[in-house]
Amino acid sequence: MKVLILVLLGVVILQAAPIRKLEDLLPTRYPPEHELVYWCTYANQCDFCWECVHGICRNRIQADWPVIHQNDWIINCTVSRWNGICSYYEGPRNHTDHQMDCANPTSHTYPHREYMKIYERDDL
């Protein structure tokens, strides 16, 4: 439910200030800090969305997400924006490229709990 509210809030923010007004973004593995909410909503497996310390990872944007063990679910991503088209590339392992209208974004990733390796306090 909280994720849905976050997504709806993101859509409202995009409607108020469309991302098209932003400059083009050359392909990067490190999007600007002020754009992380946008990118991490639609590309939530990307490593720049997670902060990992000693193998335990927390989502940098969505505080209600579970704490997870660092694992292959978190992937290296490259994001870019050109002429109103936002892209993120899941690679190099997946070699998957997603493109979407920046003003009407769609998520191509979503949490598969069985792959996330959720951290439990009993794991200590």
From Swiss-Prot:
Summary of the function given for this chain in its UniProt record: Plays a role in virus cell tropism, and may be required for efficient virus replication in macrophages.
Entry keyword Glycoprotein: yes
Glycosylation sites: N76, N94
Coiled-coil boundaries: none
Descriptive protein name: Protein MGF 110-8L
Record keywords, A-Z: Glycoprotein, Signal
InterPro entries found in the cross-reference section: ASFV_fam_110
Family from the record: Belongs to the asfivirus MGF 110 family.
Signal peptide residues on this chain, from the entry's feature table: 1-16
Organism of provenance: African swine fever virus (isolate Tick/South Africa/Pretoriuskop Pr4/1996)
Pfam families tied to this protein: v110 (PF01639)
